[in-house]
């Protein structure tokens, strides 16, 4: 994330490309291609899988903001949400997280358990970081285990530590060292 990825590279005299941040997940990128035609005019093509929202980026741990794409001739992307409205304000996003924090506490204090189902890459790291930031220093939470399960997530968490730098790496290391966090690293006993 802190390493620049927007370096223009040449394949040959006709094809130039670069990767830029997609703002979706750690390391997520869009591909920009410039193809020089025989008449020396250029075609600018951009390919992206999922792109992150710059409005929600501040709530995603360790994900750099999406880079802006200059005008292009062709833009190819997946269409997860197509034309559906998915916009919210910063205030709404903050209120949503405060409500989630309150609901989690209410459930846990009433003796209930909570199961989060999440992708091993990206979402899981956001959830455990959010829980750590919400409750890591809360006395009432000190004996509540946060159990994460799966072989893949252990590898992905290790990869995060290899990619992150500075304060982000230190924060994620604190999350992974959190005494509440219990990781099942194999399928024994599951």
Question: PLM features: residue spans?
Answer:
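Hard-cation-handling environments
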Residues: 99-190
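His/Asp/Glu-rich metal-coordinating catalytic cores
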Residues: 1-126, 132-140
């Amino acid at each position: 994330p802190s390493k620049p990825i927007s370096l223009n590279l040449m394949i040959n005299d006709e094809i130039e490309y670069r990767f830029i941040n997609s703002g979706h997940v750690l390391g997520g990128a869009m591909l920009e291609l410039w193809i020089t035609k025989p008449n020396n005019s250029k075609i600018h093509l951009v390919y992206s899988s999922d792109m992150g929202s710059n409005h929600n980026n501040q709530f995603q741990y360790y994900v750099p903001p999406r880079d802006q794409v200059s005008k292009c001739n062709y833009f190819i992307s997946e269409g997860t949400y197509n034309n559906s409205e998915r916009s919210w304000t910063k205030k709404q996003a903050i209120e949503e997280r405060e409500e989630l924090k309150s609901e989690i506490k209410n459930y846990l204090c009433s003796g209930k358990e909570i199961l989060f189902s999440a992708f091993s890459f990206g979402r899981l790291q956001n959830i455990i970081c959010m829980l750590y930031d919400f409750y890591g220093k809360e006395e009432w939470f000190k004996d509540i285990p946060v159990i994460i399960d799966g072989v893949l997530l252990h590898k992905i968490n290790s990869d995060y530590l290899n990619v992150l730098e500075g304060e982000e790496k230190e924060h994620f290391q604190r999350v992974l060292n959190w005494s509440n966090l219990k990781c099942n690293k194999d399928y024994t006993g599951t």
